[in-house]
Swiss-Prot record:
This is Cytoplasmic FMR1-interacting protein 1 homolog. It comes from Danio rerio. Keywords: Actin-binding, Cell projection, Cell shape, Cytoplasm, Developmental protein, Differentiation, Neurogenesis, Synapse, Synaptosome. One of its GO terms (biological process) is ruffle organization. Belongs to the CYFIP family. It comes from the Eukaryota. Involved in formation of membrane ruffles and lamellipodia protrusions and in axon outgrowth. Binds to F-actin but not to RNA. It is found in: Cytoplasm; Cytoplasm, Perinuclear region; Cell projection, Lamellipodium; Cell projection, Ruffle. One of its GO terms (molecular function) is RNA 7-methylguanosine cap binding. GO terms for cellular component: cytoplasm; lamellipodium; neuron projection; perinuclear region of cytoplasm; ruffle; SCAR complex; synapse. InterPro entries: CYRIA/CYRIB_Rac1-bd, Cytoplasmic_FMR1-int. The keyword S-adenosyl-L-methionine does not apply. Signal peptide: none annotated.
Length: 1253
């Protein structure tokens, strides 16, 4: 029975599923993550040598020697790491200032305690180099013995001796370079001597020896040379080693970059060791033992090679320091100065790209066929030739990767040895430090791009080959097995037959040993009936040997044994007078040599994943222990600006080069390489910690810069898309080109959801989203802040900025999961929980403090313009915030273009501004603003204006009749001028009183224009909503067609868009209710003819409750005719005042106050119901009528009559227009016919003569 699972366990299991990384479709632009395939190490270091009892005993003995030498090489590598990564301890230890210091004993004790383990390591290092030199010289002595000189020495053995030479060269250079090692030893020695730690003579002597060993430069080389020179014929053996290296280098018999560089170092150091007091390399060349011309050519091509970490060696230095260089100087071209083309990476890019393209195409063909056919096809179905193709492809790929990695390392090495200066590079400052001159200022832009591109090729190809690792591994094992078995069982059969037949026992024993060592017979044993084993010919039908096929590679010892025994057959030395080679036929020799060459790479290929990693390893680009040592403790670590991985990454970001943008993660991967190397090869935690600290800093910088760039890029696109096309065209005609942003490849980076860096999986998309969201919010915030620091006209610019941010958000939302722009806008506008936001508050603020008191309305243009004579004090605003272009319109050019567009809206407030206010404030904001404006109007009407009305009513004549026509217009003008003398001369009338009325008028006009704009917006909404509400336009009907049939077809066509039935069918009850309400509101909004302005007028009417506005009840019970007690009579007096023409240098009322003044007066008259009386009884209108009749023109009391009448006529037209608009809004609810209740019946008037009767 299945075990029961509790609910908690089940839920936790489901939660765990979230942690499973699911394969996604993100583009692959990052290097291969650490392989999860187990990497077995089949290299036994000859531990299994005793199993091969069938092999030749000499070579088994040689394998034993090999094994111990490999162990020594490994130990030497550990000492090299120890020296290279040594950091000075003594600098961190407090120093004893004087002998009287009380705590000096304690300091010395601590010094000894800390430094003793380190000094022990140095002591062990000194012993090791002695042992290693003795061991190496012992091997040389053994091989140079007179009786063994003719003996065959295998290439593998010579190569191991070559590795020893390389080890000595590296260790000596490291020891020379590290001053901190000597300082630490000196500090220890001082402390130990003070504490009398070293009392025994032997330990004192050893300490002295160590001091001398560390102090003497080239001590290891000197010891080695001294011991070698006493060995007779050592130069011959070294010549063999150098020749082997020349041969390997020339024929590319190496795979990893370190092997390539090792061959060159062995050539150089080998020549230096050979050219001593007892031997001369130039004499050896004369004997044709070595070819110096060839070596010179190699050293000329590649002048500098990596020695260890960031230490480099100039190969010519080995030649220059050799004993017989001076007299043979002219032979060498490599010692002359001048750069090799090898270091000009830009020139080699064409060749590298071609190689990359060719190989990638070939690899893609196989990769695709594996994907297409791999699932349905068994591996066994592949033919030998197909496996061979894959084998060749794997080898070719590794060689290419190795070649490119070596290329990068060689350029880097050259640059480290040849730092720049202020003369070569103008950007390099005088005080730049050595490492900075070697890295930061030492590469041109083209060189950086070339390095990035090669790096991307290496890492990209590593990914592709890594994906096919299992396919390659199988093909490699299968091919090696086939090649080995075919060669041993088939190819060697004929030579074996010949050897048996001709009784060549040595050759026969070697061939049989090879076959016994490696053959895997189909039947499990060698066929005993094979005629070749008896030296006989095959029968006429032939002798059939079936070679089996498996995917199993040979062991490392097996391969070594086979290759060494084969080599012994074709070698020029054999230990006897006659070589074994002479016993073999020509074709056999060629077959053996061919197999021997091919099998060289088998070891590398059998460890495919490890070799792949080594061929792509560029970890040394980060390590800088040598240069840190040169700073003598001034630097603990270099800043990121000097670090190669960041230099390359930052260069891509700074140049914004589109073709390189996708490679940016590859240069960051150098940190992965370095961290892996620090942990697995150097095994130093502190180095890893330093790399990690740099990565933390660099990645923050990377995300910061990248997100800023991406935001700016999409902002520029948004700004360009929304820029008026006519302006762009006009600018182009004028020769000022506003360019479109060049396309960049940020999309690929935006899709990266798991970037691998130092074992972390980073969601780059999420990090960029956070920064872009912040930038968008900052942009919105800035747009509103700019609006808050400017007047009402800048509402146009605010709307433009918000539109561009909206468009930027829309473009970015394709790749990033951003908050909705409306939510961001509400947050920036402080409108999340508050009922109204910053924009609404500022709009009202501007209306109240600047717009109402300082703007003049012009009914002809329908615009408000700033008054030329301000009555209120200057309004102080905050300074607009400074901002980078990407937070405004995107770029400087776009900022300029948009500024020029919005400058056209700067000098007025009109319908465009008010429409923008409507769109930005919405119903809620408009309601708030209007409510506040009504409060302003109320305070004015019930405050200052009321006081002025009361004051002016007192100076008005109690009775002022309209004079008869017979007086003529000049007389009437003089009469009114005299009657209204006090009003005309009232000082504050044309300033404070008119100013207050203008504010009321402007407030009213703003409400009216807002409603008009709102209506247009609502009509637009309605038209947009119509298709979704089943409101369809009437279709054109031709003759003979039926309207209802056509309409039904149209309805059927758009039925899928009809929203309410759709939500009623699919939505929740809450959604259905919302949909119905929305539908109803949209349909009814304009249909029911609601009017804001009418409500506002009604509200204002309630403010006019003081009796002064209407005056006392008329004595005749109908209306006041000649009495000046109602507001319209006061307004007539005011109108008479502002109709008087002004002097040449005075401002008119229109210039000072605009039409707002007239709107205020007319509104009060209309709301008081005094409109018609005003029309009939107005003083100015009466003068106009009389002047129109008599046409006189005189100057009365310095008032030109004709000019005054012209002004009266203009104001009469304006007043009529205002009354018409006001009456339209006030009577909109009254219908056409006035109700009967409003009609009053009066007795007909009776003539006075009859009245007395």
């Amino acid at each position: 029975m299945a075990s029961t699972v509790t609910l908690e366990d089940a839920l936790s299991n489901v939660d765990l599923l979230e942690e499973l990384p699911l394969p996604d479709q993100q583009p692959c632009i990052e290097p291969l993550p650490s392989s999860l395939i187990y990497q077995p190490n089949f290299n036994t270091n000859f531990e299994d040598r005793n199993a091969f009892v069938t092999g030749i005993a000499r070579y088994i003995e040689q394998a034993t020697v090999h094994s111990s030498m490999n162990d020594m090489l490994e130990e030497g590598q550990q000492y090299a790491v120890m020296l290279y990564t040594w950091r000075c301890c003594s600098r961190a230890i407090p120093q004893v200032k004087c002998n009287e210091q009380p705590n000096r004993v304690e300091i010395y004790e601590k010094t000894v305690e800390v430094l003793e383990p380190e000094v022990n390591k140095l002591m062990n290092f000194m012993y090791f180099q002695r042992t290693a030199i003795d061991r190496f010289c012992g091997e040389v002595r053994r091989l140079c013995h007179a009786e063994r000189r003719k003996d065959f020495v295998s290439e593998a053995y010579l190569l191991t001796l070559g590795k020893f030479i390389n080890m000595f060269a590296v260790l000596d250079e490291l020891k020379n370079m590290k001053c901190s090692v000597k300082n630490d030893h000196s500090a220890y020695k001082r402390a130990a001597q003070f504490l009398r730690k070293m009392s025994e003579p032997s330990s004192i002597q050893e300490s002295q020896n160590l001091s001398m060993f560390l102090a003497n430069h080239n001590k290891i080389t000197q010891s080695l040379q001294q011991q070698l020179e006493v060995i007779n014929g050592y130069d011959e053996l070294l010549a063999d080693i150098v020749n082997l290296c020349v041969d390997y280098y020339e024929n590319k018999m190496y795979l990893t970059p370190s092997e390539r560089h090792m061959l060159l170092k062995v050539m150089g150091f080998g020549l230096y060791l050979m050219d001593g007091s007892n031997s001369n390399i130039y004499k050896l060349e004369a004997k044709k033992r070595i070819n110096l011309t060839k070596i010179d050519k190699f050293f000329k091509q590649l002048q500098v090679v990596p020695l260890f970490g960031d230490m480099q060696i100039e190969l010519a230095r080995y030649i220059k320091t050799s004993a017989h260089y001076e007299e043979n100087k002219s032979r060498w071209s490599c010692t002359s100065t001048g750069s090799s083309p090898q270091y000009n990476v830009c020139e080699q890019m064409i060749q590298i790209r071609e190689g990359h393209m060719r190989f990638i195409s070939e690899l893609a063909r196989y990769s695709n066929s594996e994907v297409v056919t791999g699932s349905g096809r068994q591996d066994a179905q592949k033919t030998d030739s197909e496996y061979r193709k894959l084998f060749d492809l794997a080898l070719q790929g590794l060689q290419l990767l190795s070649q490119w990695s070596a290329q990068i390392m060689e350029v880097y090495s050259w640059k480290l040895v040849h730092p720049t200066d202020k003369y070569s590079n103008k950007e390099c400052p005088d005080n730049a430090e050595e490492y900075e001159r070697a890295t930061r200022y030492n590469y041109t832009s083209e060189e950086k791009f070339a390095l990035v591109e090669v790096l991307a090729m290496i890492k990209g190809l590593q990914v592709l080959m890594g994906r096919m690792e299992s396919v390659f591994n199988h093909a490699i094992r299968h091919t090696i097995y086939s090649a080995l078995q075919d060669f041993a069982q088939v190819t060697l059969r004929e030579p074996l037959r010949q050897a048996i037949k001709k009784k060549k026992n040595v050759v026969q024993s070697v061939l049989q040993a090879i076959r016994k060592t490696v053959c895997d017979w189909e039947t499990g044993r060698e066929p005993h009936n094979d005629p070749a084993l008896r030296g006989e010919k095959d029968p006429k039908g032939g002798f059939d040997i079936k070679v089996p096929r498996r995917a199993v590679g040979p062991s490392s010892t097996q391969l070594y044994m086979v290759r060494t025994m084969l080599e012994s057959l074709v070698a020029d030395k054999s230990g006897s007078k006659k070589t074994l080679r002479s016993s073999l036929e020509g074709p056999t020799i060629l077959d053996i040599e061919k197999f021997h060459r091919e099998s060289f790479f088998y070891t590398h290929l059998l460890n495919f994943s490890e070799t792949l990693q080594q061929c792509c390893d560029l970890s040394q680009l980060w390590f800088r222990e040598f240069f840190l040592e040169l700073t003598m403790g001034r630097r603990i670590q270099f800043p990121i600006e000097m670090s190669m991985p960041w230099i390359l990454t930052d260069h891509i970001l700074e140049t914004k080069e589109a073709s390189m943008m996708e490679y940016v993660l590859y240069s960051l991967d150098l940190y992965n390489d370095s961290a892996h190397y620090a942990l697995t090869k150097f095994k130093k935690q502190f180095l890893y910690d330093e790399i990690e600290a740099e990565v933390n800093l660099c990645f923050d910088q990377f995300v910061y810069k990248l997100a800023d760039q991406i935001f700016a890029y999409y902002k520029v696109i948004a700004g360009s898309l929304l820029l008026d096309k006519r302006l762009r065209a006009e600018c182009k005609n004028q020769g000022a080109n506003i360019s479109w942003p060049s396309s960049n490849r940020y999309e690929t980076l935006l899709k990266q959801r798991h970037v691998q860096l130092l074992g972390r999986s980073i969601d780059l998309n999420r990090l960029i989203t956070q920064r872009v969201s912040s930038a968008l919010y900052k942009s919105l915030e800035l747009a509103i802040s700019r609006f808050e620091s400017e007047d009402l006209t800048s509402i146009m610019e605010l709307e433009g900025l918000l539109d561009i941010n909206r468009m930027t958000h829309k473009l970015l939302s394709k790749y990033l999961t951003l908050d909705s722009i409306d939510a961001m806008f509400r947050e920036a506008n402080h409108n999340v929980s508050a009922p109204y936001g910053r924009i609404t508050l500022h709009v009202f603020w501007e209306l109240n403090y600047d717009f109402l008191p300082n703007y003049c309305y012009n009914g002809s243009t329908n615009r408000f313009v700033r008054t030329i004579l301000p009555f209120s004090q200057e309004f102080q605003r905050d300074k607009p915030p400074n901002a980078q272009p990407q937070y405004l319109y995107g770029s400087k050019a776009l900022n300029l273009a948009y500024s020029s567009i919005y400058s056209l809206y700067r000098n007025f407030v009109g319908p465009p501004h008010i429409k923008a206010i409507c769109r930005l404030l919405g119903y809620q904001g408009i309601a708030v603003v209007m409510e506040e404006l009504l409060k302003v109007v109320k305070s004015l009407l019930q405050g200052t204006i009321l006081q002025y009305v009361k004051t002016l009513m007192e100076v008005m004549p109690k009775i002022c009749r309209l004079p008869r026509h017979e007086y003529g217009s000049p007389g009437i003008l003089e009469f009114f001028h005299h009657q209204l003398k006090d009003i005309v001369e009232y000082a504050e009338l044309k300033s404070v009183c008119f100013q207050n009325l203008r504010e009321v008028g402007n407030a009213l006009l703003f409400c009216l224009l807002t409603e008009q704009s709102l209506s247009q917006e609502e009509v637009c909404d309605l038209l947009h909503a119509a298709p979704f509400q089943n409101i369809l336009p009437r279709v054109h009907v031709k003759e003979g067609e039926r309207l209802d049939a056509k309409m039904k077809r149209l309805e059927a066509k758009y039925t899928a868009l009809h929203l309410v039935p759709l939500i009623e069918r699919l939505g929740t009850p809450q959604q259905i209710a919302i949909a119905r309400e929305g539908d109803l509101l949209t349909k009814e909004r304009l249909c029911c003819g609601l009017s804001i302005f009418e409500v506002i007028l009604t509200r204002v009417r309630a403010y006019l409750d003081d009796p002064i506005w209407r005056g006392p009840l008329p004595s005749n019970g109908v209306m006041h005719v000649d009495e000046c007690v109602e507001f319209h009579r006061l307004w007539s007096a005011m109108q008479f005042v502002y109709c008087i023409p002004v002097g040449a240098h005075e401002f008119t009322v229109e210039q000072c106050f605009g039409d707002g003044l007239n709107w205020a007066g007319c509104m009060i008259i209309t709301l008081l119901g005094q409109h018609r009386r005003f029309d009939i009884l107005d003083f100015s209108y009466h003068l106009l009528k009389v002047q129109k009749h008599d046409g006189k023109d005189e100057i009365i009391k310095s008032v030109p009559l004709k000019k005054m009448v012209d002004r009266i006529r203009k104001f009469q037209i304006l007043n009529d227009e205002i009354f018409a608009i006001l009456n339209k809004y006030l009577k909109s609810g009254d219908g056409e016919n006035m109700p009967v209740e409003h009609v009053r019946c009066f007795q007909p008037p009776i003539h006075q003569s009859l009245a007395s009767n």
